[in-house]
Amino acid sequence: MAVNVRTMWSSMRAQVAMVVALVFLVRGAWCGPPKVPPGKNITATYGKDWLDAKATWYGKPTGAGPDDNGGGCGYKDVNKPPFNSMGACGNIPIFKDGLGCGSCFEIKCDKPVECSGKPVVVHITDMNYEPIAAYHFDLAGTAFGAMAKKGEEEKLRKAGIIDMQFRRVKCKYDSKVTFHLEKGCGPNYLALLVKYVDGDGDIVAVDVKEKGSDTYEPLKHSWGAIWRKDSDKPLKGPLTVRLTTEGGTKSVYDDVIPANWKANTAYTAK
């Protein structure tokens, strides 16, 4: 049987072209939008200058973000005071593997037209790793809507992703510093969730001093706003806690953890 070489060659070229096209389609699906490297870490410095960022939102439109009102910092009830659903997931240079938890920022937007241009304060309560901008705030629905003109909140949320500006500010929590002993704590294991710290808001070191001791022992950063200590011997309460904020401020809370402390219990500074 005669073979038409030209026809075969044309067919092969068509098949090769199809394969190449599929490769590019698959690569495009894998690669997605261009990734933007994170910016420099936002430190405990306070000025008048604003930085550019992207803003998105998640959860319920008028909610606190996570369905369980928690988040990557380990806080509970971020829908209640003093957070009041004004939480934000910071990207890498803002969340800082949990060391940015509790820090506070003023945010605002000028566009689209629904933006008020007036700053509102949000708290870092969660994390995001979406590489869409050097700085990215994934906001609770309530916090995103707070940047809008009155009555335009829902229209602004429909924008989905917008340009915004931000700057770090001192925290002014309307609550006392609270230490929550996490579930699983026992005589030889201490895990503290620290929250509502005025000023810098975020913590870089936690130390505890046992009853009758003059020496502070450091806790290790576990995750989010949680710090832990594994001890070879049972810890003797009451425990005094010393906090160091990112800006270097040290605060001491004498005997804040009682001798008969219990897991899954919050103790408030006097």
Curated annotation (Swiss-Prot):
Its main location: secreted. This is Expansin-B10. Residues 188-269 form the Expansin-like CBD domain. One of its GO terms (biological process) is sexual reproduction. Keywords: Allergen, Cell wall, Cell wall biogenesis/degradation, Disulfide bond, Glycoprotein, Membrane, Secreted, Signal. Belongs to the expansin family. Expansin B subfamily. Pfam families: DPBB_1 (PF03330), Expansin_C (PF01357). Disulfide bonds join 73-101, 104-171, 109-115. SMART domains: DPBB_1 (SM00837). GO terms for cellular component: extracellular region; membrane. Expressed in pollen. It is a peripheral membrane protein. Residues 70-176 form the Expansin-like EG45 domain. It is found in: Secreted, Cell wall; Membrane. Residues 1-31 form the signal peptide. InterPro entries: Expan_Lol_pI, Expansin/allergen_DPBB_dom, Expansin_CBD, Expansin_CBD_sf, LolPI, RlpA-like_DPBB, RlpA-like_sf. May aid fertilization by loosening the cell wall of the stigma and style, thereby facilitating penetration of the pollen tube. Acts selectively on grass cell walls, which are relatively poor in pectins and xyloglucans and rich in glucuronoarabinoxylans and (1-3),(1-4)-beta-D-glucans, when compared with cell walls of other angiosperms, including other monocots.
